[in-house]
Each structure stands twice: as structure tokens, then as C-alpha cells.
Amino acid sequence: MAAVAAVAARRRRSWTGLVLACLGVCLGLTLAVDRSNFKTCEESSFCKRQRSIRPGQSPYRALLDSLQLGPDTLTIHLINEVTKVLLVLELQGLQKNMTRIRIDELEPRRPRYRVPDVLVAEPPTARLSVSGQDDNSVEVTVAEGPYKIILTARPFRLDLLEDRSLLLSVNARGLLNFEHQRAPRVSQGSKDPAEGDGAQPEEAPGDGDKPEEIQGKAEKDEPGAWEETFKTHSDSKPYGPTSVGLDFSLPGMEHVYGIPEHADSLRLKVTEGGDPYRLYNLDVFQYELYNPMALYGSVPVLLAHSPHRDLGIFWLNAAETWVDISSNTAGKTLFGKMLDYLQGSGETPQTDVRWMSESGIIDVFLLLGPSVFDVFRQYASLTGTQALPPLFSLGYHQSRWNYRDEADVLEVNQGFDDHNLPCDFIWLDIEHADGKRYFTWDPSRFPQPRTMLEHLASKRRKLVAIVDPHIKVDSSYRVHEELQNLGLYVKTRDGSDYEGWCWPGAASYPDFTNPKMRAWWADMFRFENYEGSSSNLYVWNDMNEPSVFNGPEVTMLKDAQHYGGWEHRDLHNIYGFYVHMATADGLVLRSGGVERPFVLSRAFFAGSQRFGAVWTGDNTAEWDHLKISIPMCLSLGLVGVSFCGADVGGFFKNPEPELLVRWYQMGAYQPFFRAHAHLDTGRREPWLLPTQYQDMIRDALGQRYSLLPFWYTLFYQAHREGVPVMRALWVHYPQDVTTFSIDDEFLLGDALLVHPVTDSEAHGVQVYLPGQGEVWYDVHSYQKYHGPQTLYLPVTLSSIPVFQRGGTIVPRWMRVRRSSDCMKDDPITLFVALSPQGTAQGELFLDDGHTFNYQTGHEFLLRRFSFSGNTLVSSSADSKGHFETPVWIERVVIIGAGKPATVVLQTKGSPESRLSFQHDPETSVLILRKPGVNVASDWSIHLR
């Protein structure tokens, strides 16, 4: 039997090697991305066409006699005065200081794709009224906000004004370009490019009535309009060119952020002279840094910031999208004279943003702030907030491709206990499944998965197994057979099941845009369907861009067919969103709607925050990749996706011990904390390093677990309000220009400032501490620093600079145990960092840590702690919540305090009691021992 197992193992290794070899052929298995596998704008025909239109007089005119005004919607026709094609514009005022603009063809040959399921609901509207009109413009007032919209007819333009201040302008540069659908012109003797592909455009009513000179005028078929080839792949484009583009001008704005995912700086760069930023979910092998290439996820949201204003643009389109950014001055634009009139003469700095998408309609939300926190809440009201993760998912995750078998998993599990290291999860990659057949277990390596899971559960730990959305084509594989029989796969343009190449070899791809497919997928996670699973098994969705090794740009053909007759080109960027959604729904379903899910996804879109965590993909064990994870996660946080992390240690290559230690130190302060590694890397569990490095990693893990109450509270705030967990400095210091470009340090909430060490052999770092009149305390030494200032701080390998802002209160657990589940009832220590005014405040959220009872039964606590006038008060911050807990306050550490004569505790219904304390005059730290009060109770502590 042992010999048979050995032969089987060799075969599996050979198969994996074959797939890796194929992947190398497809992707260019080198030390960096093979750029030739991915399009530039010049190679993307619609981007090239859109970008060829230069700023100038727009050919579009609004037909004022077509204007119709409803209670909350203005509709008006736009005519392209060259082609005579009519569009229809819908303008809606929305509550919470937002505006929605939609532009579509008035009479399309076939309906255009409108992105479903991303918005949590149709947003509440605000009443519109016409407050002025002349022969070339209409002034519209929005009842819910202090702003007006001026619609100019010729050339078409929209200007949004607040009082006499111009906030932004739409089509000021004349770059609106809407490629209307048209009948393919077939030259004599040639074949219709759509002929015979099963997806011919239907005849549109009235086409025969259009004069030939109008139909053909200025509509030359440029290369790539009706068929496009990239490398060996052909895109049939049966409906012809359908791209859309529109420009937005932002006077007074020089700093823009967002539109992740890119391995680039936090502040977006001007793209003139290079490629635009690309949004097209792709499996990019060993991605390069500091360029605008597309990566695994796309969130089409851009934030603009100035010391006086914040705005957001949400471009709701799931097709391939490019975003051009240029710097300008308002005096050089078409609305410069208006700006002079409104704001006075003189040049105003300005950023221009141009969006270009391959298909769909123009559907854009303008988020008008005025503060960045207003923009966060506005966007969250549209797409939802970050899902509240289970507490245990905020702990440490140990992963690699791959843990060999059950014995290996249990040995790793024991290793954490033997070396006194906390851990919540162990992960299994693709080798755990039987021949890469997801929802199965390799019978020779994992013959008793439930027993293995039970052993992990006895240590209060969990397991994650990968479930990818490519299904092995195998008639004996139940998942494939059912999906094939039910007709739930993505189809080719001739109606057969689409088949590509991925980890299992030949694979088909479930059509997750179909609600029936998502329901089927969710049902697969029931314990009776996912054999060997249990309640402590959670899920990882990888390769869900989708990744197709032999497809164009390592993804699906754009003319593949989805539910409803839509092409893949229309919805590509939302495919991974649906995979994530269906998987999260499945984990909720298996518990009868009781348990919160944990699902990690590589691909994402606007709204993905509702379903779980994401990570920055297949990074490399290099210092620059350590660095780039900061702006990558900060960018995601700005657009609502807070649960972000990077593979600790780097996925590719082997990190030297110094780099691995520095990565653990940073990962401990990023929202999602997972170590992961490639199949060909050496094992790197912490105890395999020399003792001195083990100790440093143990300390980093200890910092993470100590702060879990703080992390959990931050995630509840993100869930409740839509604010990011990990924040760029400028978010809290919007008028401090120094912070606008900082992306090597960050804030956690408003309380902690973290400056990771991201250079080899560093002996010190430059740290910027913001805030006029604010103080910052080193969390290790309690040394006080005043802001704003830049400090050079010496560092050793054993620590990174972390500061607590004066004026905040941070809850901690001080006993680090095997896992977070072992700590959840431990007592709390409050770290009270006093402001120069002697004040501080903070919150603590507690519930059972894993169910929806906080929602369905209001079983939670949200406590507010405030310090003022030498008194610390605990009170309820949400009276709706009620939760019984044994958690009590064990200690209060007040930083920046003088020595009192006495310290008195007051609780309702009890006499005053004195507390013992200790004061260190050198650090001004006062420690109050064992107040002993339950965290759910109201109490106060007085320093006298």
C-alpha cells in the first residue's frame, strides 16, 4: 500500500508540474510579468478609439425642447450633430448629497447592459426643480442639497455648483463619446462578421429609413471595431463597437485616489504620455510595481481631495475600463470663464478624469461630500458597508501551497502550540482536492477530513479550503455533471459549454451571473453536499477573475455568453463579485442563517465588501512588494473594501529572515493577516527560523492578538458607518498637505499610527506625526511627541514605530492565548492616551463573535469610554444593544497623567471604592489595577 501511495504521489507531482509548465507557456514563467500577455491601451481597440478623441468642442447637443422633469428625474435627449444619433440622459438628485447621471441610446438595436446587484437598493431620490432657463441652458435645483446643476445645451455640458463655487463639470473637455450600435456594413462579396456565430444583431426598427449619407457619415470602421485579434485569440464582436467615454473636470483638486486594484502609489499619477489606469480583472503572474496595469480586482470609484473639499465619482460599469488622469488649470478649460465669474479670476489647479468602458451604459454617481467621511457614507449607502467579520478571522492565518496531508496539517497545528504562537486558521490550497475537483478531498492525503477538522476544533482553530470557480471536465465528477445537465455553465457564442484550461486541465466555468447558478453553488456548501466539511471549515475563492490559462490575457473570451444573452465583455469585472457572493451565501445557508461567513476572494468589484476579505494577490518576497502592500490596502479602504491584506513573506521566492520578520511586523497591523507561499518555496513556519527571529515573530503575533478588541471595534465601525479600518493620514488631516502623498505609514481608526520598516538593514525611519496641537505616544516606551513634525527614529529588527494619538482610548487583551476563541472572554485593559487638554475617548464593541445575533436580536454591546476632568466614564453608545458577558475591566493605563492622591471607582447602586494605582513620573503613566467592573455596566473612575 505504501508503494502504491508513493506512485500515486509521484503522479500527482508530475501532473502539477505539467500544469505549471503549461502555466509557464501561457504566462511567461520569468521573474517578472510578461507584459506581452496583457493589452496596452494601444492594443485595446476601444481604448485606442476613445483616446484618439482629443479635448475640444463636443459634437453633442442637448435638445432643450425634449426636456421632461419629473419629481426626482430630469430626462433630456442628446444628439450627436455629426451622426445624428440620439441619446437619452437621465439626471437624478439623490438624498445624502449625491447626483446620478445615466446616458443610454434612445433607441438601441438591443438593450445595453446595466449592472445589477451591486447597489444594495435603488437610492432615495431628492426633488428637482427648474430654477432658471434660457435658450442654451437650464438651471436645476436639488431640494436635498445646497447645490445646483447647470445643463448647457450646445455643446452639452453639466456643471455642479454649490453657492458660487463650481464643484465639478461633466463633458467640459468635450470627450463624451458614445459608440451607438449599428448594423454591420458588409462590402460586396464579404461576409457579415457576426454571421453564423449564433449572436447576430437583430434588425432594429427604422434602420432602413435612415438616409445612407447619415448612417455612413463619420462612422468609418476602424480596425478592431467589428472583430479584434490579440495574439492568437479572436474576438468576434457580433454587436460591433459599443464603447462609452466621458470626462469630469475637478477645479481646485490636485490629489485623486482610488480606482483599485493597481500596484502603485496611493495618490494617482497623471497618465498623459503613458497608459491610463486599467480596470479589468486579470490573473497577472508576478505583477510589476508602480504602473497602471490591471490586476485581480476593480472598484471603479475615484476620490478627489483638496484642503477644502472631497468628492467622489462612482462609474458603475462592469466592462473593461480605462481611466485617464490629467493635470490642468481651470483657466485652460471650456468652463474657465464660468469659474472666473464664480470664484474670481486667476488660475485654479484642476484634475481632469476621463473614464472609458468597452460596453454598457454611462451610469455614474457623483458623491459631493463635502468631507471625505461624507463621501465614505455616501458610497456605502449605495453599495453597502464592510461585512462584520467573525472575530476569529481577524487572527493569524497560516497558509501555503500546499500542506501535504492530514498529518502535515496536524503537525503544523501542533507546532504553534509547541512554540507558544497564536494562530486561528490553517489553509489548504488546490492539492487538497481529488485531482483539483473542488468540494472533494484527495482520498490518499485527506482520507478523514472531518476527523482532522474535529482535532482543529478541539484546539479552537479553523481550516480554510480553496474552492475555485473552474470545474474539471470529467463525466464522473458530480459537480461537473450536474452543472452540465442543468445548463449552468458559461456558453460559447455558438451555445456550447465554454471550456478553458486551468489547474484541473480542461475546465468549464459556472455562470455566476445566473441566480440559479448562485443558488446551486450556495447549496453545495451544505454539510450533506460538501462531504467531509464541518462548521469550522471556511472558504477561499481564488482564480475568480476568471483565470483561463489558455484564454486571451489569461481570462475568458469576451464573446462568451452569459445568462440573459449578455456577452462576457459586458460583465467581466463582476464575475468574481458573484463568486464571492454565492460562496458567502453558502456558508450562511449551511448554518441556517445563523453564522457569519468568512470567505477570501482574489477578484472583487464595487460591493464586494459585503461578502468578506480580499488580498493583493501573488506578490513576491522582495522589499518593494512589502512596501507596496500599504498603498494597495489603503486604496481599497478608501473605496469601502476594508478587509485587505497581503501574503506575509511574499508568495513567490524565499524571503530572508529579516524580510520575513519585517513582513510579520507589518502584517500584524493590516486588516487581513495571512502568511502564504508558493509550492516551490521553502517551508517558512515561524519555528523553522533561528530562535532570535522566532521571538520577533512571536512578539508581532502577540501585538496582533492583544489588539483584537480594538480591531473588532474598528470593523464594527466600518460595518456600521462605511469608514475604512486602515486609513491614509490625509483622511484625518484633510488640510495638512504633507499627508496627501504619504503612503509608507497609516492610521488604524483614528487612534494608532503605524510606520512599518520596509527597507533592508534599516537602522532608522523617517516618521511624520500629523496634527497641529496634537500629541502622539510611542506604544512601547510611552514617550510623547508633538505634531506636526517629521522624526528620525532609530529602529532595531525587533520592533516598528507605532504611536497612539493623544485623545484616544484603545482596548486590549493582555493574555495572548492559542487562538482568539480562547481569549474572547478575557478581561480588558484600557489604554487611555490623553490629549493636551486632558481628554480622551474610545469605543468597544462586543458580541458572541460569530453569529448574526447582533443584528437579529440586538445581542451586542457598544460601550463608549470618555475621559475628561480627571474622570473616566463608561456608558452605552447604543441603547438598543444588550449582551451578557463575563468580560471585565482588569486594568486602566492612562498615558500622559499626573499622580493623583486617590483614585475612586463609582458604580450604580454601590458605594465608592478606592483603587490601587501606580504612577511612573518619567513616562507620566498611571496604572489603575483591577477596577473589576463588568464591561457591560456603567461606571466612572475619578482621579482626585
From Swiss-Prot:
PTM comment: Contains sialylated polysaccharide chains.
Cystine bridges: C41-C47, C633-C644
Modified residues (Phosphoserine): S52
GO molecular function: alpha-glucosidase activity; carbohydrate binding; Glc2Man9GlcNAc2 oligosaccharide glucosidase activity; glucan 1,3-alpha-glucosidase activity
Family matches, as CDD domains: GH31_GANC_GANAB_alpha, GH31_N
Subcellular location field: Endoplasmic reticulum; Golgi apparatus; Melanosome
Feature: compositional bias, Basic and acidic residues: 207-225
Gene3D superfamilies, alphabetized: Glycosidases (3.20.20.80), glycosyl hydrolase (family 31) (2.60.40.1760), Golgi alpha-mannosidase II (2.60.40.1180)
Active site (catalytic residues): D542 (nucleophile), D618 (proton donor)
Signal sequence residues: 1-32
Biochemical pathway: Glycan metabolism; N-glycan metabolism
PROSITE patterns in the record: GLYCOSYL_HYDROL_F31_1, GLYCOSYL_HYDROL_F31_2
Gene Ontology BP term (one): N-glycan processing
Region: Disordered, residue numbers: 181-225
GO cellular component annotations of the record: glucosidase II complex; Golgi apparatus; intracellular membrane-bounded organelle; melanosome
Residues carrying covalently attached carbohydrate according to the record: N97
EC identifiers of the protein: 3.2.1.207
Keywords attached to this entry: Disulfide bond, Endoplasmic reticulum, Glycoprotein, Glycosidase, Golgi apparatus, Hydrolase, Phosphoprotein, Signal
UniProt: substrate binding residues: D283, D429, R602, H676
The family this protein is said to belong to: Belongs to the glycosyl hydrolase 31 family.
Assembly and oligomerization: Heterodimer of a catalytic alpha subunit (GANAB) and a beta subunit (PRKCSH). Binds glycosylated PTPRC.
Stated role: Catalytic subunit of glucosidase II that cleaves sequentially the 2 innermost alpha-1,3-linked glucose residues from the Glc(2)Man(9)GlcNAc(2) oligosaccharide precursor of immature glycoproteins. Required for PKD1/Polycystin-1 and PKD2/Polycystin-2 maturation and localization to the cell surface and cilia.
Protein name: Neutral alpha-glucosidase AB
Species this protein is from: Sus scrofa
